[in-house]
């Protein structure tokens, strides 16, 4: 089952990141995020607060998509998260759950027109 959270956001540029956020940077884009609660546990719902800091090109970022997959198992999350916009470059995603221990790949897609820029982070979830 493919789960994704989608939210429309406006153009983002390099930003000041509040304490407690982690930056995720590629040559093309940058976001900052934090988990709530901070420590992820197997089978526990959590939320993500995300700031879209920078994306390529002149077009505004119109969507941010958050998803999680287990590459070794070929599946994703069992629940469909919900995104809520908090500001033009900031949003909160709830209803996230990593239901198994192991390596998860979390992807954050910034969508501008026909262009999609992906940032990803692997998380090793212990039992």
Residue ranges and their predicted role:
Residues 1-10:
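Bacterial N-terminal signal peptides
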Residues 13-105, 109-127:
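Contiguous segments within soluble domain cores/interaction surfaces
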């Amino acid at each position: 089952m493919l789960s994704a959270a989608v939210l429309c956001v406006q153009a983002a540029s390099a930003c000041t990141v509040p304490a407690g956020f982690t930056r995720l940077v590629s040559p093309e884009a940058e976001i900052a995020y934090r988990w709530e609660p901070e420590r992820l546990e197997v089978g526990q719902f959590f939320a993500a607060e995300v700031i879209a800091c920078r994306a390529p090109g002149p077009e505004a970022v119109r969507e941010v998509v958050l998803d999680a997959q287990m590459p070794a198992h070929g599946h994703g999350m069992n629940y469909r998260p919900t995104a809520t916009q908090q500001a033009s470059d900031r949003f909160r995603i709830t209803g996230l759950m990593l239901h198994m221990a192991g390596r998860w790949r979390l992807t954050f897609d910034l969508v501008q027109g026909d262009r999609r820029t992906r940032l990803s982070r692997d998380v090793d979830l212990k039992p």
